[in-house]
């Protein structure tokens, strides 16, 4: 059975605007992020989905509530789709940090390895593929989490493709399908802007 996963990056926060690492810090949507989610809602209204999942972080939960407010479906929280931890870098300005440190295999900064982040996101999707009868899912998560999973899929296929910075804008839609034993990225970072 084919499965379709509509993956949504949460709306903007003050730390997004200030270009700070957020990771698992629970930073709420900014006023701009709330407006982004409201503006994106008509795009999500056009999609059919049978279940809604969200990261436990408030910026994802609030985005999920806004874009699905007319649906009569519960929002299910799952820790496996939380953002990647950036350890001691959380709250720091991105431009002030050694980005290379964030991509080593054994991070010494107290954060999460990007491959582990991709692995747990995949585990979440694999559970839905193997143990759930539904076919269409809305998943509100984070740019790092979704992006690391996509990168891992590209690596499996032998592609040396890297997602450019900004490819997953706030409130954007990424569509991933599972069929015939494999995941396929159909759309990345789509917005109607």
Could you tell me what each predicted segment is?
Residues 6, 76-78, 186:
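General small-molecule cofactor/ligand-binding pocket signal
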Residues 8, 12-71, 112:
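Active-site-proximal alpha-helix that buttresses catalytic centers in soluble enzyme cores
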Residues 46-48, 128-135:
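Glycine-rich phosphate-binding loop signature in dinucleotide/nucleotide-binding domains
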Residues 186-193:
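Short, solvent-exposed aromatic-acidic interface loops
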Residues 157-184:
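Domain-level recognition of soluble alpha/beta enzyme cores
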Residues 5, 135-144:
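Generic beta-sheet signal
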